[in-house]
Swiss-Prot record:
Additional free-text comment from the UniProt record: The basic functional RuBisCO is composed of a large chain homodimer in a 'head-to-tail' conformation. In form I RuBisCO this homodimer is arranged in a barrel-like tetramer with the small subunits forming a tetrameric 'cap' on each end of the 'barrel'.
Subunit structure: Heterohexadecamer of 8 large chains and 8 small chains.
Function: RuBisCO catalyzes two reactions: the carboxylation of D-ribulose 1,5-bisphosphate, the primary event in carbon dioxide fixation, as well as the oxidative fragmentation of the pentose substrate in the photorespiration process. Both reactions occur simultaneously and in competition at the same active site.
Main localization of the protein described in the UniProt heading: plastid
Keyword Oxidoreductase attached: yes
Species this chain originates from: Tamarindus indica (Tamarind)
Gene3D superfamilies to which the protein is assigned, alphabetical: Ribulose bisphosphate carboxylase, large subunit, C-terminal domain (3.20.20.110), RuBisCO large subunit, N-terminal domain (3.30.70.150)
Protein name, UniProt field: Ribulose bisphosphate carboxylase large chain
Residues at the active site: K166 (proton acceptor), H285 (proton acceptor)
Amino acid sequence: SVGFKAGVKDYKLTYYTPDYETKDTDILAAFRVTPQPGVPPEEAGAEVAAESSTGTWTTVWTDGLTSLDRYKGRCYHIEPVAGEENQYIAYVAYPLDLFEEGSVTNMFTSIVGNVFGFKALRALRLEDLRIPTAYTKTFQGPPHGIQVERDKLNKYGRPLLGCTIKPKLGLSAKNYGRAVYECLRGGLDFTKDDENVNSQPFMRWRDRFLFCAEAIYKAQAETGEIKGHYLNATAGTWEEMIKRAVFARELGVPIVMHDYLTGGFTANTSLAHYCRDNGLLLHIHRAMHAVIDRQKNHGMHFRVLAKALRLSGGDHIHAGTVVGKLEGEREITLGFVDLLRDDFIEKDRSRGIYFTQDWVSLPGVLPVASGGIHVWHMPALTEIFGDDSVLQFGGGTLGHPWGNAPGAVANRVALEACVQARNEGRDLAREGNEIIREASKWSPELAAACEVWKE
């Protein structure tokens, strides 16, 4: 017969291919699929593969003008999720040709663009992505990475210390700069703009940049250490964001900051390129991540957002604290912390890692632990995150009864004590409290902090 067979057909005829052998160049995705009652899992998995690649709801004559076999996504494996009713992990392979080189934006538009609103699915969550080396090589990645950052800052063998300046909204630029100076002077490596400090009526960005630069230079002169403040360059337009980054470079400061999810991947990648070309480090905040990753059965796991950030570019990214959370959470968090830092990560389902990932020497990203932590947590943080991390104590610095500088001193003393104890072979997990107590005997600032936040 002439023509083609019109009409609606089952996706699984075309897009469910359990005998498919994945290629090294395929982008692989693991989706957690919750089909509507009565929808077989194979059909649901095939729908996801179709709608995120070449498929549409009915047969179209223009299908004959291309080779579907070459361009279609394929659902190649489905497994039920243990302990969950009617929930499956569907593995989908996408041919590399479907994606624009060096564009996280395009990768996400394809893989998670349309398919999450599908009627046949009750819920859908992207759990992990395997980025093939051929695609990774089209990205610049982090502007500098862990090693270059250490060399720029001349700080080795320990985690870095930071602090978010509070109250986050309402301070004038001069008072803000003063708070920055005191923290850096006391012994922190970095201070940080809050994610929502951009350029508001009470503190315009240029004034803040100037006073923070003054604080940095003064603290550097007094301590003999290199200091930084994450100047938030996030803005309403891409041009304005770059304008702020240019001004930071002209001031000679070491690092700027971006909210990569609210600012968007396109803006983030542009900023990362600018930062590499101009020697600026780039700190990334993940504001809005919980909108995407909080639900267990729908959205995207943070490890996917973390992988995307490593491709798009950033030298630091917030990654949760682990401390005081559930034990299982700890393994999962450490899984994506390794995905950020290491060059090669083996598949390990107990840590939430669905695919072996080879980053082909793309620079690593420093994970930032931030939120509700204080000096008593220092041994655990040092043990869990190791040297390649940034530990950020906002309230844990500024909440010190004697002020910011003593708060910074307390944190630095606690950190140095933990690192020294670890290097001497002591067990931080078991002896942590004892190590902090010993150190507080010769540091009144630490003793006062220990008293305020005793558990």
